[in-house]
Amino acid sequence: MGSVRSDGCDLYYEEVGEGAPILLIHPSGATASTWGSATEELARIGRVISYDRRGYARSGGEPVRSVSTHTTDAAAILEHLRTPPAVVVGTSAGATMAIDLAVRRPDLVQVVIAHESPWRFTRHLPTVPQVAALAKIGSLALRGRHGDAAEALLRSAYSYRDGGTAWDAFPEEWRRAARRNARAALADFLITIGNYPSSADLATVEVPVVCTHGSRSPNFMFRVTRSLASAIPAARMHRIEGAGHAAPFDATTNFVQLIADTIHLLTP
């Protein structure tokens, strides 16, 4: 573990394993410590680097208002560690940041694995449960109940198409972490559901990108992922069996195997 200075913030990071660098960019309401057993399993195939994004936990700082700031931070970590081009893995908001790293700093990226980025989420017709959840989130946030608002957001985001939500199955410490980092989680949602990176930016991406979606995710998540993949020339789609939005938790083995297979395909 250690820290990297990036634009006034000391970013906390952890690393384990040896081999191909695998940078994990966590989703909203998470930290370097909420990847569960996926970290240990990935360490068998590469050098796993995880970190608390700016605004979260041990990195501290105010909630971030632009994806590009997170992208700059991710680049700073890879540059500090002097890694060769990395396998950059992100889920949800972290997936948007992983893709933006391929846009801004392709020299640092070997391949991106992006699970269910909410890119252009606002352009898709919301479901009735989503409308209700968004109304609740907004009401709670306006009343200053940020922890409750973040819980409502993540409970909805991690819902399964067949009922229930991964949120209820998460370890209690993960849920506490989400509530403690509520303002950062809510900021993540706002900055990643729009049109960033732009379609023009995505069209410039030349490194391979794997856009994944879960077999247990609501149908709209497939449409969001398909829209993103179609905007990136070097992208392909992949369905992770048994997974919802929380793929590293829902289907750890399948999530790790996808990363291992991707690394194998890129190895000369």
Question: Residue spans of the language-model regions?
Answer:
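Active-site loop/oxyanion-hole signature of alpha/beta-hydrolase fold enzymes
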Residues: 37-40, 49-89, 93, 254-257
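Conserved HGGG/HGGXW glycine-rich cap/lid loop of the alpha/beta-hydrolase fold
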Residues: 2-61, 77
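Short beta-to-alpha linker loops that shape the active-site pocket of alpha/beta-hydrolase fold enzymes
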Residues: 52-56, 118, 243
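Short beta-strand/loop motif that positions the catalytic acidic residue
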Residues: 205, 211-213
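Hydrophobic, aromatic-rich cap/lid helix
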Residues: 163, 172-198
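Conserved hydrolase catalytic core segment
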Residues: 84-125
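Conserved alpha/beta-hydrolase "acid-adjacent" motif
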Residues: 218-224
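Catalytic histidine-centered segment of alpha/beta-hydrolase-like enzymes
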Residues: 240-256
